[in-house]
Amino acid sequence: MPSDYRPRLVADQSLPYLAGLLDAVTDVTYLPSQEITRERLIEEKAEGLLIRSVTRCNQSLLEGTMVRSIATATAGFDHIDRDYCSSHGILWHNSPGCNARSVAHWVMGVLAERALRLKRPLAQETLAIIGVGHVGGNVQQMAEALGVK
């Protein structure tokens, strides 16, 4: 590749904090999700996509494009046709745990509201967490910090 090569990306303009972040190393076209179409990907010569779950990455979007990498700013990936991507050499990446702290904060808010309503301090409660993955691990840390058993 030439030394002045810059990858070309198409990004969903609704991705928070992304605008300008990659401009030093790549050429990014920011589009509303509904404008991320096959025709636009071809026109922009996009090699990569930065998307949310509203963009369905399947044959009808990707066929005939230069896209070789897809990154979704979501934990889920059911909007990406993994079989199509695999058979066409397109790498894809999701963002597991990307909203785990926010969900854990919400859970703790619900627990705090319950404690206020019942007039019982959280430190007197015992919490059972089913699964200590991204969200459960964050809930455990926050609950322990507040004295919950």
Question: Predicted segments — roles?
Answer:
Residues A24-T26, T65-M66, H88, L146:
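Short, structured coil segments at secondary-structure junctions
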Residues E43, C85-S87, A145:
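Residues at the C-terminal ends
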Residues K119-K149:
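Rossmann-like dinucleotide/phosphate-binding beta-alpha-beta segment
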Residues M1-A46, V135, V139, G147:
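N-terminal glycine-/charge-rich "phosphate-binding" loop or analogous flexible N-terminal tail
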